[in-house]
């Protein structure tokens, strides 16, 4: 196309008042489909709450889960729903409420980190279609998959300079590094929110650079309570020691007086 032809078309378009179609506004944010199991639901909330704790010093991020990500007009019109189980978007307005993640309302920003909580019925999609979408369209820097029912299932990829996913190598504990967040992602054995009722599960958790577990709000509260109880116990012991010392001093003074000595002169 010549410069002259392009200019003529621009003039014609301006003359007709043509404007590019506006993004759709009748977006659906809930398809009524719950997460696979209660364990999947708790696993998602654990990741969200852990991210909120780990990034508490920042305000320019959003952590969410099980919500739709809208990235194109065609996708929205086709009702081609894509909802990561967990994601974090950085360098965004973290004060806004979100029913979903609409990229054209977020200055074109996509999630920086995504975790899909797999099951036997979704593994092929999480490793195939979704992985390709997050790599080629979202350009999500760090992508992970994990089946809460399979402790050995954790895998992850990081986007290289060519915008292609490269598999992440696990450390000696089987954890994977998340460059975007500056955190480790690995399993933790225990009970969370009364799940399971007996025994333990292998939950996917965040760890800091020093490999310390990022605590959940209830774990922080429990730790603070334990510290408060320990401080109270120490204070009571100190009070008892002081009372015992005072009692010994009084007995000694009485004994000295009985011997005709003035305890104040000794």
Q: Could you say what each language-model-derived stretch is?
A:
Residues 2-36, 53, 71-84, 89-113, ...:
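C-terminal interaction segment
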Residues 41-54, 62:
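A structured, charge-rich N-terminal accessory region that forms the first stable segment of a protein
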Residues 45, 49, 65, 82-88:
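N-terminal, well-ordered alpha-helical segments
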Residues 57-72:
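A short acidic/basic microdomain associated with nuclease active sites
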Residues 62-64, 144-147:
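A structural signal for short, well-ordered beta-strand segments and their strand-loop junctions
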Residues 141:
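Short acidic/polar active-site loop segments enriched in Thr and Asp
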């Amino acid at each position: 196309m010549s410069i002259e032809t392009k200019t003529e078309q621009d003039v014609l378009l301006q003359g007709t008042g043509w404007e590019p179609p506006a993004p759709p506004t009748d977006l659906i944010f809930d398809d009524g489909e719950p997460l696979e199991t209660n364990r999947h639901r708790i696993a998602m909330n654990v990741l969200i709450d852990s991210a909120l704790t780990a990034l508490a010093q920042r305000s320019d991020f959003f952590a969410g889960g099980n919500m739709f990500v809208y990235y194109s007009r065609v996708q929205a019109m086709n009702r081609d729903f894509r909802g990561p189980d967990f994601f974090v978007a950085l360098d965004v307005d973290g004060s806004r409420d979100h029913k979903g993640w609409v990229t054209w309302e977020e200055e074109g920003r996509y999630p920086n980190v995504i975790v899909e909580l797999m099951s036997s019925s979704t593994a092929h999609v999480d490793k195939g279609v979704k992985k390709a979408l997050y790599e080629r369209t979202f350009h999500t820097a760090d992508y992970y998959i994990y089946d809460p029912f399979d402790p050995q299932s954790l895998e992850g990829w990081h986007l290289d300079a060519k915008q292609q996913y490269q598999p992440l190598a696990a450390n000696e504990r089987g954890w994977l590094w998340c460059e975007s967040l500056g955190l480790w992602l690995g399993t933790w054995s225990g009970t969370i929110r009364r799940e399971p009722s007996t025994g333990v599960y292998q939950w996917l958790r965040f760890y800091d650079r020093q490999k310390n577990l990022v605590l959940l709000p209830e774990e922080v509260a429990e730790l603070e309570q334990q510290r408060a109880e320990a401080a109270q116990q120490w204070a009571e012991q100190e009070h008892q020691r002081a009372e015992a010392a005072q009692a010994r001093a009084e007995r000694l003074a009485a004994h000295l007086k009985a011997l005709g000595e003035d305890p104040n002169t000794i």
